[in-house]
Amino acid sequence: LRPLGLRLQERLAAALPADGRLHTEFASDNEYMVNADRALLARALDALLENAVQHTSEGGCITVRIANGTLSVANTGDAIPDHALPRLWEAYYQADPSRSTKGDGLGLSIAKTVFDLHGYTCGAENTDAGPKFWFKFA
């Protein structure tokens, strides 16, 4: 087992565009060890991080936090319409199909499936800074 924070920092670095157009913040209140299928957890983490990268404008910030057994990925992108929040985890669903972001609408659905398989809960909400996705693993 490797600490979740270390794994997340590696995955975040891999998900970021090479041009340095995005800022990141990372914080963890502990070194959490998560008992999970490594490959599946990596895929779920990649989906959350790639989603944040896709929906963060140039100069924006992606914030990853681990606290109290919950991992959250927030970004400074546009708020998600309230009616769309419950459906974000559905396969092929896109809150705003007219947006010019790439993606097929499967990433968050895959992440939710992985979280469900491990007995984790997950959710999405809007904050003052932008959208935040989270999953509770402890």
Task: For each feature predicted by the language model, list its residue ranges.
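Short conserved segments within the C-terminal catalytic ATPase subdomain
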Residues: 15-25
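Conserved micro-motifs of the catalytic ATP-binding
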Residues: 33-36
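Short helix-loop "hinge" at the ATP-lid/N-box region of the Bergerat-fold HATPase_c
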Residues: 52-53
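Short beta-strand/loop element within the Bergerat-fold HATPase_c
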Residues: 59-70
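Short conserved segment of the HATPase_c
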Residues: 80-94
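Short alpha-helical Gxxx[C/S/T] motif in the catalytic ATP-binding
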Residues: 107, 111
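Conserved glycine-rich
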Residues: 119-120
